Amino acid sequence: EFDIGAIPVGQEITVKWRGKPIFIRHRSEEEIAEAESVDVSSLPDPQPDDARVIAGPGGELEKQWLIVVGICTHLGCVPLSYRGEYDGYFCPCHGSVYDTSGRIRKGPAPLNLEVPPYEFVSDTRIKIG
């Protein structure tokens, strides 16, 4: 379990799960709006933002929380946060660019950053796995 209550809006922490980095990002309203405004059919790995977040204890989608495995889907490098032209993630190894929803936008990566299985155990705690 991880406490996410202290992560400020617009910030991110990295935790380890099964030896992998997990990015836990507290998205701003602007980041959410940007992710929702994308024409999903134009994406290499089409997936709406709502499919990349889950409902919290109250049953509402917790759109402010993006939780992804921090491993590029190209060759396994660790992307840099808040980088690239979409303010999401940038992989320094081969130039893949992900948006604020962790979706691949440019570069050689074939898939979006993976969303691990997780659940909210309270308003401020998540359990991964």
Where are these regions (language model features)?
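Short hydrophobic-aromatic micro-motifs
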Residues: I22-R25, I128
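Short, surface-exposed charged micro-motifs
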Residues: T14, F23, P117
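C-terminal segment of N-terminal export signals and the immediately downstream linker at the start
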Residues: E1-K20
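Residue-level structural signal for beta-strand termini and adjacent loop
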Residues: R27-S28, P110
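Rieske [2Fe-2S] iron-sulfur-binding domain
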Residues: E34-G129
